[in-house]
């Protein structure tokens, strides 16, 4: 039985977690990593992996996934494998405010594995949104937004910006003699960047992942 791209990515995640942490991910962690709405989708893919002989599951254990067949041999004696270009493993770097700017927190909290097709352009990392000032763009509190790292942006693009060591996501507006960061929620006021402020574009918004809540 052939595996889908998602199932291959799940198998890679299982092997990686066993290698790095010594234990496989739980079904809940797999669902969260791939943005599934619930664990039933994770169960479906795990059943397919088991039927294909790639894993076996120990009944009654929350982390009862075991590698089997070729996957187990590959872990014991890893072979050189081509890098897949359709799957991304992205670090989650703290939080970004979609509201008032909050202090930057760039420590890597977690990694998420997902298909590249969710984003354009390709992101370099994810940030967790706090606040609802970008609500009318469909960006909500708790979303994970993809960020393409760049210092260049055009007026009208949604950017992740740094203002005096604080990070925020807003709509960039560049005027003749001023720069403003606009919310997409009428309950919030625009942020005008003052000449004496330390301001920089950290990246472009390029899509989002909505974790199951």
From Swiss-Prot:
GO biological process: DNA repair; DNA replication; negative regulation of DNA-templated transcription; proteolysis; SOS response
GO MF assignments: DNA-binding transcription repressor activity; sequence-specific DNA binding; serine-type endopeptidase activity
Sites annotated Cleavage: 98-99
DNA-binding positions: 27-47
GO cellular component terms, A-Z: protein-DNA complex
Coiled coil start-end: none
CDD domains for the chain: S24_LexA-like
Reactions the enzyme catalyzes: Hydrolysis of Ala-|-Gly bond in repressor LexA
EC number: 3.4.21.88
Gene3D superfamilies: Umud Fragment, subunit A (2.10.109.10), Winged helix-like DNA-binding domain superfamily/Winged helix DNA-binding domain (1.10.10.10)
Keywords linked to the UniProt accession: Autocatalytic cleavage, DNA damage, DNA repair, DNA replication, DNA-binding, Hydrolase, Repressor, SOS response, Transcription, Transcription regulation
Ranges that cross the membrane: none
Protein role: Represses a number of genes involved in the response to DNA damage (SOS response), including recA and lexA. In the presence of single-stranded DNA, RecA interacts with LexA causing an autocatalytic cleavage which disrupts the DNA-binding part of LexA, leading to derepression of the SOS regulon and eventually DNA repair.
Family of this protein: Belongs to the peptidase S24 family.
NCBIfam families assigned to the protein according to its UniProt record, in alphabetical order: lexA
Name used for this protein in its record: LexA repressor 2
Designated gene of the protein: lexA2
